[in-house]
């Protein structure tokens, strides 16, 4: 199983490599790279099953973010796991934001990786591994409300603008927190911004 690790932190690279080797991946199938250009070449050459990327490797340069987005789209059979670069926040969850794109905390546990990668690690030639996770999506109301919330508007302002009761706004906020698996506003904003960066945004259910 070919894998790519794009993370400037040697501690993380070592941890991920150790995890993969312990699960039967051969060392020669684990490729460390540093730049987005190298990632594009490596994905084309190796057709990896899984790519681990630290968002710090691309988030500060719009052209790099755009290229990451293209690479993810060009390799639908590769699972991309993007680690959030967010400090001093307890969040060890992960979210599937596209069929082949997962946003994760760096604090993800080996057991969680086993759950996510189990089928892929066991994958025999010609059998595609899949992730049994719902893709993150919001209703139109939740999506509109989340944007206002991120603009710094409070419950009453959102209630007035959307012409709904404050209690309903609070209920929608609760749904958003449940779907993004955190009550931490900083993490919610971070997930939204990162998803916007490498996709066209969190899926909105148009029904």
From Swiss-Prot:
NCBIfam families: PRK15411.1 (NF011940). This is Transcriptional regulatory protein RcsA. Residues 131-196 form the HTH luxR-type domain. GO terms for molecular function: DNA binding. The keyword Transcription applies. Keywords: DNA-binding, Sensory transduction, Transcription, Transcription regulation. Residues 155-174 bind DNA. The gene is rcsA. Component of the Rcs signaling system, which controls transcription of numerous genes. Binds, with RcsB, to the RcsAB box to regulate expression of genes. PROSITE patterns: HTH_LUXR_1, HTH_LUXR_2. It comes from Salmonella typhimurium (strain LT2 / SGSC1412 / ATCC 700720). Belongs to the RcsA family. Interacts with RcsB. It comes from the Bacteria. GO terms for biological process: regulation of DNA-templated transcription. InterPro entries: RcsA, Sig_transdc_resp-reg_C-effctor, Tscrpt_reg_LuxR_C, WH-like_DNA-bd_sf.
